[in-house]
Amino acid sequence: MQIFVKTLTGKTITLEVEPSDTIENVKAKIQDKEGIPPDQQRLIFAGKQLEDGRTLSDYNIQKESTLHLVLRLRGGIIEPSLRILAQKYNCDKMICRKCYARLHPRATNCRKKKCGHTNNLRPKKKLK
């Protein structure tokens, strides 16, 4: 039977499958066509994420059904030098006490008109 897999980019992939095929088999077929590793694929049908060990018939997926393919979110640690750079960019700021504008670290006056370019500034609080 034929099923369709729709990606987030809107592309539709056509697959030839059997009702007895497992979700793992379907992911392998998607890898063959698109080159996306199965461990990065998440298949959704009728609002449910499909589990690898189950079959298409377990989820009542019939001919010409459409599955939705989303990619797994990747997480992890940031390289130390990039972390320091990001921290400097986001955390080393001065804050206007009147309008809460974020200013560069060496600012002496606020750049906003609404607080009258006040010189009442404080350093941004550090994250714990």
UniProtKB/Swiss-Prot annotation:
- On whether Cytoplasm is a keyword of this UniProt record, the answer is yes
Q: Cross-link Glycyl lysine isopeptide (Gly-Lys) (interchain with K-? in acceptor proteins) maps to which residues of the chain?
A: 76
Family matches, as Pfam families: Ribosomal_L40e (PF01020), ubiquitin (PF00240)
Q: Where is the Ubiquitin-like domain?
A: 1-76
- Keywords, A to Z? Cytoplasm, Isopeptide bond, Nucleus, Ribonucleoprotein, Ribosomal protein, Ubl conjugation
Q: Which positions does the site annotation Essential for function cover? A: 68
Q: Name one GO biological process term.
A: protein modification process
Return the InterPro entries for the record: Ribosomal_eL40_dom (IPR001975), Ribosomal_eL40_sf (IPR038587), Ubiquitin-like_dom (IPR000626), Ubiquitin-like_domsf (IPR029071), Ubiquitin_CS (IPR019954), Ubiquitin_dom (IPR019956), Ubiquitin_ubiquitin-like (IPR050158)
Q: Which SUPFAM superfamilies match?
A: Ubiquitin-like
Does this UniProt record's set of keywords contain Nucleus?
Answer: yes
Instruction: Give site residues, Interacts with activating enzyme.
Output: 54, 72
Q: Which family does it belong to?
A: In the N-terminal section; belongs to the ubiquitin family.
Q: What is this protein called?
A: Ubiquitin-ribosomal protein eL40 fusion protein
Q: State the gene name recorded for this protein.
A: RpL40
